[in-house]
Structure formats: C-alpha cells, structure tokens
C-alpha cells in the first residue's frame, strides 16, 4: 500500500482525491495493500464484491448454517481483507459498488464475473464448506493442493519444440476465479486486465466480449493472469483471446500485442516458462514487473527515471 501511495505522489502530483478504487478479488496480495490508500486519500468510489451481502440468497446452499446472520458473520471472518476495506469505506462515507458483468467503470467494462457465477464460487470455495463431510473433503483437497504446490516448486524442465505448451491440469482457487476482468478501448488500443482470473473466469468473459463490442481474438495489452501461472490459462482460451499460434517467432518490433506479467523480483516460480512461451507463440512481446514497475502508454510523454522494458527471451524449455 505504501508503495502505491509513493507512486501516486511522485508521478501524479500527489493528488488528495482518487476517482475510483477497484478490488479485483479478496486475496491479501490484491486487497490487503488498499487499506492505507482508503485511509490516507479521499476516494470517490470503491468497487468491490462482498460475499456477505448475499447470505440470504446463499443460506440454503450451506447446510451447516441455519441463520443468515451467522453465515454473514462467517463470510466476513473468511474474507478479512475486504471486510476491513468495507469498514474504512463506510467510516469515510465512500460508496461501494458491485463490479459484476456489464458494469461500466469509467472507460472500462466488466466482463466477469456475473453475479450468478460469483455466488457459485462462494459456495465452491475451499474456505466455505457446506457440511462436515464436505469440510473433511476440503481439508483433503487443501492438503492435496499443498502437495501439488510443493511439487510445482520442485518442477523439472524439458526442452520443447516451437508451439508446444505444457499447462497444469490443476485449477486455480475459487477466490482467483472471482477476479474482476476489465476491458477498455483507449487510444485505439484494446486493453484487458485479468487480476488472478482462472480459466472459468476467462471463458465467461470471452462469452460476454461481443456485448462489450470486443471482437475476439484481438487484445493489444494483455495483463497475464496470476503472475503467469500455468493453472490459469489454456491453449484453447489463449487462442480465443489472442489468436492462434504463429508458424514462427515474430521479429523484434513486429509483435502483435504486449503481454504484461506482474511478478515479484524474488518470486522464482513466476512467470512460468510455459506461459511466456504461449504468449510469444501468438506474437506477443512479453514484459514483467520483476525488475520494477511497468507502464504502457500511447503518445504519452517520457517519465523521468523510467526506461523501455526489455522483453523476455523465448524459453526453449518449459515445465514438465
């Protein structure tokens, strides 16, 4: 959160007012840092989905809960980051809106999630078991996920031919699938922000694209979901959004789009090589935030202290 404030102060002349803040999903690495932003700046609108608002609609789907109030309280406990954001917003009188499919936020259109799918994801989440039996299954699933995560950290690499893409057969979390997917057409560029969206979210968003006057394939600036994880994309979905694989790697300067991956410098596990390969297979120039922040612009002035990002090289190998 402090780094966000520092960036805003330095490059946007320290404004005291922010028009809109959008919370993509409830995970701490996305929602946690926004507390200080809401506390220290005046915010016009907060866009954030809150599971407890729908406790009355969901109560029949949770056999362990008989009281709507108890379910509402439990959902607040499960998602503490957005619960705290709500408290701050209400204290400061900031209106909170729901970023569901079809919502318009400035120049952006929300492509996913729909409300119905969001409610399904709340029920499906490993954090919200419906019964004692399902809780046991959830614990087993969580243990399995831990083992899979450890296995991914110890993953080996295989040399692969051009066009080969080895994605994980595991799915991402329900919370990641809740991610708000935003589309905008700015300065002739088609921009897609995905948060940590998984395959289900990307599929739902693609199904709504034509309503937002977005003809697929065709994205100019693609924020690769979930730090470049193999669990969030597939060959079929990338074909829908970005187009089919090319016969050869495009020459430098002739790329068809820019893929931007948010990944921490100390994160040795992301982005995954398979995902970087997939972007380049479709003509993408791939850049990451591992060596600092990244901005993309069009006909904009130079920013002091910033230099052109060096695109990632094509990985000749990928995760086994």
State where each predicted segment sits.
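Metallo-beta-lactamase
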Residues: 18-29, 222-226
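Metal-dependent catalytic neighborhoods of phosphoester/phosphodiester hydrolases
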Residues: 31-40, 234-238, 273
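C-terminal regulatory/interaction regions
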Residues: 200, 207-212, 216, 236-258, ...
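Pre-active-site segment of Zn-dependent metallo-hydrolases
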Residues: 1-21, 36, 122-126, 200-214
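Active-site metal-binding loops of divalent metal-dependent hydrolases
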Residues: 26, 50-51, 113-115, 195-197, ...
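Conserved beta-strand hairpin/beta-sheet module of binuclear metal-dependent hydrolase folds
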Residues: 1-15, 175-200
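Flexible, acidic/histidine-containing loops and adjacent segments that form or flank the divalent-metal
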Residues: 39-190, 280-320
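Long, well-ordered mid-to-C-terminal structural blocks that present hydrophobic/aromatic surfaces
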Residues: 182-233
């Amino acid at each position: 959160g402090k780094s966000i404030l520092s960036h805003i102060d330095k490059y946007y002349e320290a404004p005291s007012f922010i028009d809109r803040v959008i919370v993509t999903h409830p995970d701490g690495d996305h929602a946690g840092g926004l507390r200080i932003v809401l506390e220290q700046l005046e915010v016009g609108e907060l866009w954030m989905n809150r599971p407890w608002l729908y406790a009355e609609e969901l109560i029949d789907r949770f056999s362990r809960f008989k009281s709507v109030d108890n379910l509402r309280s439990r959902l607040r406990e499960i998602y503490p980051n957005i619960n705290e954001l709500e408290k701050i917003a209400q204290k400061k009188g900031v209106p909170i809106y729901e970023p569901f499919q079809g919502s318009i936020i400035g120049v952006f259109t929300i492509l996913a999630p729909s409300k119905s799918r969001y409610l399904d994801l709340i029920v499906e989440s490993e954090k919200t078991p419906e019964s004692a039996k399902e809780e046991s299954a959830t614990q087993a699933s969580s243990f399995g996920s831990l083992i899979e995560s450890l296995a991914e950290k110890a993953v080996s690499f295989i040399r692969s031919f051009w066009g080969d893409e080895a994605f994980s057969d595991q799915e991402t979390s329900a919370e990641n699938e809740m991610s708000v997917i935003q589309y905008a057409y700015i300065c002739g560029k088609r921009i897609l922000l995905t948060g940590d969206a998984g395959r289900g979210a990307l599929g739902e968003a693609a199904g709504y694209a034509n309503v937002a006057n977005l003809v697929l394939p065709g994205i100019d600036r693609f924020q690769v979901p979930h730090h470049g994880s193999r669990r969030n994309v597939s060959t079929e979905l990338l074909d829908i959004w970005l187009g089919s694989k090319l016969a050869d790697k495009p020459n430098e300067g002739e790329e068809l789009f820019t893929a931007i991956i948010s990944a921490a410098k100390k994160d040795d596990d992301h982005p995954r090589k398979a995902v970087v390969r997939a972007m380049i297979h479709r003509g993408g120039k791939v850049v990451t935030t591992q060596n600092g922040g990244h901005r993309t612009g069009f006909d904009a002035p130079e920013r002091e202290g910033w230099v052109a990002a060096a695109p990632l090289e094509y990985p000749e190998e990928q995760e086994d």
